[in-house]
């Protein structure tokens, strides 16, 4: 891509539009500024805005095959080389308000040595973190270091979420050791979040590994080394995910066993109660048939004697159950 003027990047629909100064900071893009590899420009767009869609359709700075990709809804992380540019789709933990972290958000990037165009449909916190570093003068200096910074920030958020899920699993295990059954759906949600992360972070790890191995002209050897370290760190996170998924399976079995044991214990208790009161139920039914000649019917202490007999009978049955070790 040849050098171009800054006015080609200026439009009202941009979320962020800056030029990297090559020293870790940023400057506004001027209309007469010449954009080159030493000071690449970064344009961040919200692809849901009509102004961004119009700019993508008419700009000559990106290939035709990239326009729809930047404005679309890519599902899985991927990387595609297109001439001197590279199209990359990455996934981020959703840290927006009133959203579940496992409802991952996507960031799509077309990057060359002179131009970085990133798009999103929902806010990506990693973008804001990179922008903050740039405003403080501690950010990336070129296209390669920008991509490494984004990958590192995304992986940091993923690692933190994996650690949070790990802590939740430990809490569930501790509760089960204390014979506490977790609220319904809690384990299912954790397991779903683990599986979603596993589904999308595996290809994302592969994207990072491929970028580190590609001889991209706008990446330096140090950038490739850092990208490989990020891929390795994400790979270790995936191993933790596999272990956590296996632990949730064990937890599910333990919860089922605990609930079955509790149900059996209740059923056993009810059976013992029925056994204790079965003889008394028979006698009360026998003496309550309202027929003439009931024994003790005319005796002044007949009812008291009958109640005492029932108490003795219940006590005798309970003693027998205790002696038989059923109680």
Swiss-Prot record:
Which ranges does the record list as Periplasmic topological domains?
293-300
Q: Give the subcellular location.
A: Cell inner membrane
Molecular function (GO) terms for this protein are: cobalt ion binding; cobalt ion transmembrane transporter activity; magnesium ion binding; magnesium ion transmembrane transporter activity; zinc ion transmembrane transporter activity
The family database entries (Pfam families) matched by this protein are listed as: CorA (PF01544)
* Residue numbers on the Cytoplasmic membrane side: 1-271, 322-327
Q: Which InterPro entries match?
A: CorA_cytoplasmic_dom, CorA_TM1_TM2, MgTranspt_CorA/ZnTranspt_ZntB, Zn_transp_ZntB
Keywords linked to the UniProt accession:
Cell inner membrane, Cell membrane, Ion transport, Membrane, Transmembrane, Transmembrane helix, Transport, Zinc
User: What reactions does this protein catalyze?
Assistant: Zn(2+)(out) + H(+)(out) = Zn(2+)(in) + H(+)(in)
Report if keyword Zinc is assigned. Answer: yes
Could you name the domain of life of the organism this protein comes from? Answer: Bacteria
Name the CDD domains on file.
Answer: ZntB-like_1
Q: Name one GO cellular component term.
A: plasma membrane
Transmembrane spans: 272-292, 301-321
Mainly resides where? membrane
Bilayer topology reads: Multi-pass membrane protein
Family assignment from sequence similarity:
Belongs to the CorA metal ion transporter (MIT) (TC 1.A.35) family.
Instruction: Name the PANTHER family for this protein.
Output: CORA FAMILY METAL ION TRANSPORTER (EUROFUNG), ZINC TRANSPORT PROTEIN ZNTB
Name the job this protein performs.
Zinc transporter. Acts as a Zn(2+):proton symporter, which likely mediates zinc ion uptake.
Q: What is this protein called?
A: Zinc transport protein ZntB
């Amino acid at each position: 891509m040849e050098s171009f003027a800054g006015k080609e990047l200026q439009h009202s629909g941009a979320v962020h539009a800056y030029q990297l100064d090559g020293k870790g900071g940023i400057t506004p893009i001027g209309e007469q500024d010449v954009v080159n590899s030493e000071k690449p420009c970064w344009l961040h767009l919200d692809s849901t805005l009509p102004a961004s869609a119009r700019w993508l359709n008419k700009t000559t700075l990106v290939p035709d095959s990239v326009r729809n990709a930047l404005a679309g809804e890519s599902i899985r992380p991927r990387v595609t080389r297109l001439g001197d540019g590279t199209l990359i789709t990455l996934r981020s933990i959703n840290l927006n308000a009133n959203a579940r972290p496992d409802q991952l958000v996507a960031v799509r990037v077309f990057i060359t040595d002179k131009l970085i165009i990133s798009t999103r449909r929902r806010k990506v916190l990693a973008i804001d973190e990179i922008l903050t570093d740039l405003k403080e003068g501690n950010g990336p200096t070129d296209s390669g270091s920008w991509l490494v910074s984004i990958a590192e920030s995304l992986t940091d958020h993923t690692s933190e979420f994996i650690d949070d899920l790990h802590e939740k699993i430990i809490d569930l295990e501790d509760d089960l050791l204390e014979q506490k059954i977790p609220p319904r759906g809690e384990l299912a949600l954790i397991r779903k979040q683990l599986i979603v992360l596993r589904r999308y972070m595996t290809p994302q790890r592969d994207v990072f590994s491929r970028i580190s191995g590609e001889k991209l002209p706008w990446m330096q050897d140090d950038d490739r080394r850092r990208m490989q370290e990020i891929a390795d760190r994400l790979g270790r996170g995936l191993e933790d995910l596999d272990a956590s998924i296996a632990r949730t399976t064990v937890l599910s079995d333990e919860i089922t066993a605990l609930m079955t044991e509790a149900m059996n214990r209740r059923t056993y208790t009810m059976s013992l109660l029925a056994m204790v009161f079965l003889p008394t139920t028979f006698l009360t039914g026998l003496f309550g048939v309202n027929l003439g000649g009931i024994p003790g019917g005319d005796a002044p202490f007949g009812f008291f004697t009958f109640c005492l007999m029932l108490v003795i009978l219940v006590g005798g049955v309970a003693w027998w159950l205790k002696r038989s070790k059923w109680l």
